[in-house]
UniProtKB/Swiss-Prot annotation:
Organism annotation: Schizosaccharomyces pombe (strain 972 / ATCC 24843) (Fission yeast)
Segments on the Lumenal side according to the record's topology features: 21-152
Positions glycosylated per UniProt: 48-49, 106, 115, 122
A Pfam match: Pga1
Predominant localisation class: endoplasmic reticulum
GO cellular component: endoplasmic reticulum membrane; glycosylphosphatidylinositol-mannosyltransferase II complex; mannosyltransferase complex
Assigned keywords, A-Z: Endoplasmic reticulum, Glycoprotein, Glycosyltransferase, GPI-anchor biosynthesis, Membrane, Signal, Transferase, Transmembrane, Transmembrane helix
The name this protein goes by in its record: GPI mannosyltransferase 2 subunit C167.09
Subcellular location field: Endoplasmic reticulum membrane
Subunit structure: Part of the GPI mannosyltransferase 2 complex composed of gpi18 and C167.09.
Length: 178
């Protein structure tokens, strides 16, 4: 019984070991013929691989000299989306790169806006923050709320609950007999 308590405590604290940031939006494509086809120039092709690794330059915490260009918005075209379908757009990046990321979506493009969100005594670091490694993922939502990549976890949890119910039923029946 002690082993089960230890396993439960370890599973309870397991999420604290996750060291990444994620920004997620759920979108629904409209009933439109403006969606890009696979013949178009695409940054993300939904039929092949809906995940792309990126290195993006964030807006600095301390602005550059007046008039210097500030580029923090990136646009990515998405092909293979189906009309009237719900999708999840997810951006993930390591926690060691503190950044504020804003995701937006229009009919054919994902817009990623990235800003550095840290403070340091090193002024050059504040003016020129390091590039942020980012993974951008687009995947369909099943039943309108469940990302496809979560299905194995849902299946595993379902099996564990089923096994627990069978064990509890057997224990209850055994306890009733005694």
């Amino acid at each position: 019984m002690r082993e089960f308590r230890l396993i439960f405590v370890l599973l309870f604290f397991l999420p604290s070991f996750a060291i990444a940031n994620t920004e997620i939006i759920n979108v629904e494509t409209g009933d439109s013929n403006k969606l890009l086809t696979s013949n178009s120039v695409c940054d993300i092709e939904l039929s092949n691989n809906s995940s792309i690794p990126l290195l993006l330059k964030p807006n600095p915490t301390i602005p550059q000299a007046a008039g210097a260009p500030q580029q923090s918005k990136y646009t990515f075209s998405v092909c293979g989306l189906k009309p009237l379908q719900k999708y999840q757009i997810r951006a993930s990046w390591p926690a060691v790169y503190p950044s504020d990321i804003i995701l937006n979506y229009n009919i054919t493009h994902i817009i990623v806006e990235i800003n550095a969100s840290f403070y340091s005594h090193n002024e050059s670091l504040m003016k020129r923050p390091p590039l942020v490694p980012l993974r951008l993922v687009v995947e369909p939502l099943l039943l309108g709320f469940l990302p496809k990549s979560v299905l194995p976890i849902v299946g595993f949890v379902f099996v564990i609950i089923l096994i627990a119910l069978i064990c509890m039923t057997n224990l209850f029946i055994k306890h009733k007999r005694d």
